């Protein structure tokens, strides 16, 4: 009887651990910017941010990162140098630096764009989403993000951040996550997005849902 109770307890612990490690889905515009701000507020040691487009309409995120820096958190932000239609927003760039945030622009010619939108907190949790840091992304657009707790996945996102921060190549041939571009450059496999997406489509048995702003090759 005691053995049976212990077994049930262990099963419950296992199920709880799975639930805690499961990604949390954020859906916009319903969820708004609060989940992102809450994640930033939880940081105690380090925040890594990689962002394609950041406009002054999202100064609330600038302020949240500045507050983290003031309480001793090391905050680094990597911004796309030339997003489509213009250059990096200087107001955002300067506002981040004024608040003690380390800011760099992406290395020229390394990629066409660094289109990633991610944030890593204390190397324990990561935000990966479709949304830029703009007003419409959290208030008017259909966007999605996942908050990840899996240690290996979070470590991989941080590892790619460090490589892009330094403008270095990184072998992603054994990647856990999906990365673009799907190319081999200088003998280094830098991504797996194309083959992963095609395998997912080809593996469909009953249904396939695809929601995308644009599709081209």
Report the location of each language-model feature.
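Charged, low-complexity intrinsically disordered terminal segments
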Residues: 2-5, 9-10, 16-106, 110-217
């Amino acid at each position: 009887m005691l053995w049976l109770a212990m077994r049930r307890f262990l099963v419950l612990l296992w199920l709880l651990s799975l639930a805690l490690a499961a990604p949390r889905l954020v859906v916009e515009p319903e969820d708004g910017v609060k989940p992102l701000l809450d994640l930033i507020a939880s940081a105690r040691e380090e925040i890594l941010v990689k962002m394609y487009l950041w406009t002054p309409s999202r100064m609330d995120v600038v302020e949240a990162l500045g507050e983290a820096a003031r309480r001793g958190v090391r905050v680094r932000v990597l911004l796309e140098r030339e997003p489509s239609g213009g250059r990096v927003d200087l107001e955002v760039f300067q506002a981040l630096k004024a608040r003690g945030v380390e800011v760099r622009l992406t290395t020229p010619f390394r990629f066409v764009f660094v289109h990633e939108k991610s944030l890593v907190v204390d190397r324990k949790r990561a935000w990966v989403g479709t949304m830029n840091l703009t007003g419409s992304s959290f208030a008017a657009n259909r966007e999605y993000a996942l908050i990840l707790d899996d240690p290996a996945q979070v470590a991989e996102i941080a590892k790619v951040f460090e490589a892009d921060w330094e403008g270095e190549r990184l072998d992603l041939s054994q990647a856990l996550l999906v990365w673009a571009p799907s190319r081999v450059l200088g003998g280094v496999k830098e991504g797996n997005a194309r083959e992963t997406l095609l395998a997912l489509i080809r593996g469909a048995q009953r249904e396939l849902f695809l929601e995308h702003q644009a599709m081209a090759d």
